């Protein structure tokens, strides 16, 4: 099929500017290494939806295929670890390159080694790697994973430019006690932030001493965003969710949003896919040229609106959140709004 420039005689509502004068920036491309779940609106479903809305091409590499995400009582998981090396080889043969790489759920500890090989080939200078270390929630490691998987994920976390753990995953990665951390800080977000920073600095210093892989992210380069921390606003007394942004230098930012009723239980259990959506928005917004603090604020606002709709409809948490109707929040600023006359 051959497509010709539109004729103003046929479509008078279109702009009179010559077709050849319309210039578009080169589309950016990310590799998304994540599972594909038939139910739950998470992982690759989230990655593809977010990146596409933000004008970024997604090259999908499934780490596993599931009938539903693992929160459902009955599901089947097909491990695709053995295929990761095939994707690496074939994409390398095709000469592909990426502006961003995102990794999420891995079905086995061996998958981390395969992703490391992928990074060896594609995580070049100028490529931003975001690791969303899917390990656990509510103080517990997911039952499908174990210490070997956690140790494997630490290797990827050390290489990431951006790391987006929830509080449980942060503790698992840096071998801190979740319960003791909450007990010591007693709901004080400022105290918790300082404790997280101390744990992170200590862990990174230990990594620097024992590091044999010179491809690990430098202290200055890596940014960690600890997501979904339940908190209490001192001024209003309202329950909030806080995201802390830190690096080796200190706490560099934070964002907070009101907790919407059943959005998060007292135990911290959240809706399926929120971490995936958050990570995808942050990575894509950074690739669009925004600062990390702005990217986190956008992701927080997007999730807040989506969760509010989901709570109103009393959707089961395993089903994910109703984010699709809010994707317009993520459209690139360079794209003009559609006018009524543009649609025939």
Language-model regions, residue ranges each:
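Short, small-residue alpha-helix embedded
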Residues: 171-172, 268-292
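Conserved N-terminal subdomain of the carbohydrate kinase-like
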Residues: 27-143, 324-344
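Short, positively charged and aromatic/hydrophobic N-terminal segments
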Residues: 10, 18, 22-23
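Short pre-catalytic strand/loop immediately N-terminal to key active-site residues, enriched for Gly-Thr
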Residues: 38-39, 252-273
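Conserved phosphate/ATP/ADP-binding segment of small-molecule kinases
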Residues: 144-252, 264-267
């Amino acid at each position: 099929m051959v497509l010709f420039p539109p004729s103003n005689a046929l479509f008078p509502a279109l702009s009179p500017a010559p077709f050849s004068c319309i210039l578009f920036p080169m589309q950016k491309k990310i590799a998304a290494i994540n599972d594909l779940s038939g139910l739950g609106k998470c992982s690759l479903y989230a990655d593809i939806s977010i990146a596409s809305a933000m004008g970024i091409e997604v090259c999908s590499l499934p780490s596993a295929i599931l009938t539903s995400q693992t929160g459902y009582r009955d599901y089947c998981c097909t491990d695709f670890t053995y295929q990761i090396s095939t994707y690496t080889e074939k994409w390398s043969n095709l000469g592909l390159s990426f502006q961003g790489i995102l990794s999420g759920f891995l079905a086995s500890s061996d998958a981390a080694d395969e992703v490391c090989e992928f990074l060896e080939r594609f995580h070049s200078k100028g490529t931003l790697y975001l690791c969303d270390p899917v390990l656990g929630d509510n103080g517990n490691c997911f039952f499908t994973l174990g210490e070997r998987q956690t140790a494997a994920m630490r290797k990827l976390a050390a290489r990431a430019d951006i790391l987006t753990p929830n509080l449980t995953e942060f503790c698992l990665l840096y071998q801190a006690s979740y319960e003791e951390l909450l007990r010591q800080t007693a709901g004080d977000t400022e105290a918790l932030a300082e404790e997280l920073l101390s744990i992170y600095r200590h862990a990174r210093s230990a990594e620097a001493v024992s590091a044999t892989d010179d491809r690990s992210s430098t202290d200055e380069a890596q940014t960690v965003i600890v997501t979904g921390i339940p908190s209490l606003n001192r001024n209003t007394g309202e329950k909030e969710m806080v995201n802390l942004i830190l690096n080796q230098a200190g706490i560099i930012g934070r964002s907070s949003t009101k907790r919407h009723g059943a959005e998060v239980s007292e135990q911290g259990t959240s809706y399926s896919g929120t971490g995936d959506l958050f990570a995808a928005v942050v990575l894509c917004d950074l690739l669009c040229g925004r600062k990390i603090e702005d990217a986190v604020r956008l992701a927080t606002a997007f999730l807040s609106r989506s969760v509010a709709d989901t709570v109103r409809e009393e959707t089961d948490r395993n089903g994910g959140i109703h984010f699709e109707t809010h994707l317009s929040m993520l459209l690139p600023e360079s794209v003009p709004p559609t006018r009524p006359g543009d649609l025939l």
